[in-house]
């Protein structure tokens, strides 16, 4: 299973968060940089199986506020949808 690490200390703002996700998860150029587009790409674009490691997630909350929780919710819902093909680890 492929493993990708995302570090919450890197997310100064929402744009940087989405740019990092796009780059590390190899989303298409037309990725919309919003929660709906995140869901679409996680459930229909990324190569599976995949483990996504969210390091230093508490920093995401510091920089992004409640938006970090919204992103986490989308990622968790994708994990439920994709069963054993997509896993998240929060550190």
From Swiss-Prot:
Keyword Cytoplasm (UniProt): yes
Cellular location(s): Cytoplasm
GO cellular component: cytoplasm
Keyword Cytoplasm found: yes
A matching Pfam family: Barstar
Protein name in UniProt: Putative ribonuclease inhibitor YrdF
Family statement drawn from the similarity comment of this UniProt entry: Belongs to the barstar family.
UniProt keywords, alphabetically: Cytoplasm
InterPro entries xrefs: Barstar, Barstar-like_sf
Organism: Bacillus subtilis (strain 168)
CDD domains recorded: Barstar
């Amino acid at each position: 299973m492929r493993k990708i690490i995302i570090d919450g200390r890197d997310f100064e703002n929402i744009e940087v968060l989405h740019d990092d996700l796009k780059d590390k998860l190899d989303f298409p150029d037309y990725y919309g940089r919003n929660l709906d587009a995140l869901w679409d790409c996680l459930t229909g674009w990324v190569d599976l199986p995949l483990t996504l490691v969210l390091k230093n997630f508490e920093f995401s909350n510091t920089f992004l506020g409640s938006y970090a929780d919204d992103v986490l919710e989308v990622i968790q819902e994708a994990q439920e949808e994709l069963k054993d093909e997509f896993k998240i680890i929060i550190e």
